[in-house]
UniProtKB/Swiss-Prot annotation:
Superkingdom, natural source: Bacteria
One MF annotation (Gene Ontology) recorded for this entry: structural constituent of ribosome
Record-given protein name: Large ribosomal subunit protein bL28
Gene: rpmB
Keyword Ribonucleoprotein: yes
Family designation: Belongs to the bacterial ribosomal protein bL28 family.
InterPro entries: Ribosomal_bL28, Ribosomal_bL28/bL31-like_sf, Ribosomal_bL28_bact-type, Ribosomal_bL28_sf
Classification via HAMAP family: Ribosomal_bL28
Species the sequence originates in: Cereibacter sphaeroides (strain ATCC 17023 / DSM 158 / JCM 6121 / CCUG 31486 / LMG 2827 / NBRC 12203 / NCIMB 8253 / ATH 2.4.1.)
Gene Ontology cellular component annotations, sorted alphabetically: cytosolic large ribosomal subunit
SUPFAM superfamilies, alphabetized: L28p-like
Amino acid sequence: MSRVCELSGKAPMTGNTVSHANNKSRRRFLPNLNDVTLISDVLGQSFKLRISAAALRTVDHRGGLDAFLAKAKDDELSVKARAIKKEIEKAQATAA
């Protein structure tokens, strides 16, 4: 399982651990990923995703999974999230 957020595309970064004596050693900064279940209002279905805490706050701020995916760029989304977005768009098109 890769350490990449399925909604925002956040991935590990590299940098230095700097000691008090200014010694530098390489380290990785990992994203704060959580396994969550999000519910689509349009589809009435739940989806399990591995997303960062920041992405979870953004989903909540935008008003749910459907609203988040409507604004999200496809290149930042995982394959699974893109499929969910396509399903939601299809369901909204048939409902309209």
